[in-house]
Amino acid sequence: MVARASFHTWLSPLDGSEVVTVPVTLPSDVPAVVASARKAFESWSVTTLESRGRIIRTVAQILESRSEELAKIVRQETGKPLGASLGEIGGAVEMGYLVSSQGRHEMGSLLPSAIPGRQVRVQRMPLGVAALIVTYNAPFPNYAWKAFPALMAGNAAILKPSPATPLSAMVFGEILQEAGVPEGVFQVVHGSGETAAALIDAGVELVSFTGSYPTGQKVVEASARNLAKTVIELGGANPLIVCDDANLSAAVDAVIDSAFSNAGQRCSSASRVIVQDGVYDAFVARLMTAAESMTWGTEPDVLVSTLVDSQSVEAFESYLAQAQSVGATVDRVGALKGAPAPEACLAQPAIIQGLAIDSESGMAEFFGPATRLFRFSRDEDAIRMANTSEFGLTAAVWSSDIARAERIVEQLEAGVININGPTHGAEINMPFGGVKHSGNGSRDAGIHSIDQYSDIKVVSTFFGA
């Protein structure tokens, strides 16, 4: 039994009410958690793929049957609109069905050999104990993207959720147990960054992390001390390019969705909108009209709801003040709906103009309901501006000339790019991740997600020996 000496209480960003109080796993307790996971790994790793898949499929079925209840938990915990919360549960369900089907798929291959009588087999094998360290902005999808392939590959897994999403993580763990995941194979530990650091230092074989670049850099450095495999998905300052032949109305809708849904708390939000000179004024006029009518507040059906906590509101407002201090114009937009509680962690949406794209304020990553507008003249200028950022997670290009859009896409430094779409919207069968400071070459989700959570074993058989 792991001793826990303190507790963590989370308050809803909607109204300041208590969501849940959970026990905190202290750094000194982490080695015992890892040891129990390692013990459980011994039997779980030799369970058949089909059996593991059947359990994960059951998890998906339970998530699906309880989707409305779970969506209300997400809304209470993070402040998200109810529809968005339901959509996230659906994404977790689909990830479960995708990964569970891998139990009936080929998990290796045969290679030809130059030596007569030799057969070479390449197969996947589990790594051991996986530490899953996730952020708050999409709790159930984050858990599903990491836990399902980690478990399907035969690993034991320890989830360290954000302090902002303790209830959803606790319920997710309970559902896995209900579905038949053996004791110790999947555990949830609550705590601060010190708890996460202790997990890495305890010698886990894999660390899967979603969060900011500065923290991700520390995670990779700490993991390297034990040569632990890392799956890293970090931040973004994602560009959405609008060419002069784009459908402006549709492009405006894409910007509203990409920049302001989830209150801009996506690593894939469109925080830089790069518009061609010839249509800039017309585009901005349409965008302002659309932005003025988008709803914000704490009602369940608004587009822009709360940020996750008051510190996030302060950081967002501080960024806007910094942008104004260097000459930017900040227009506050949106239609407030209802009468939010004084404790609500709300920030009015904003549209920013007048920044240099290569300035600190022009390139910075921020979490909040805002976007920055920039102008370009030639396509090569748009490409250069888009690639100015140190990040390279997602991007979007809007043009009615698909060949032109494809030429731009070929030169963009990003891991996920949409033509005539938003900067977000990855599907579960698509690998998701970035380049430059947005990742390290690993990918979450996708049909090959199990590869990220396993290693390769090569076996040769010599016949006739």
Predicted regions mapped to residue ranges:
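N-terminal Rossmann-like NAD(P)+-binding subdomain of aldehyde/semialdehyde dehydrogenases
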Residues: 1-118
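Short, well-ordered beta-strand elements within core beta-sheets of diverse protein domains
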Residues: 19-25, 40-46, 132, 240-243, ...
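Conserved C-terminal structural/oligomerization subdomain of aldehyde/semialdehyde dehydrogenase
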Residues: 17-21, 339, 346-465
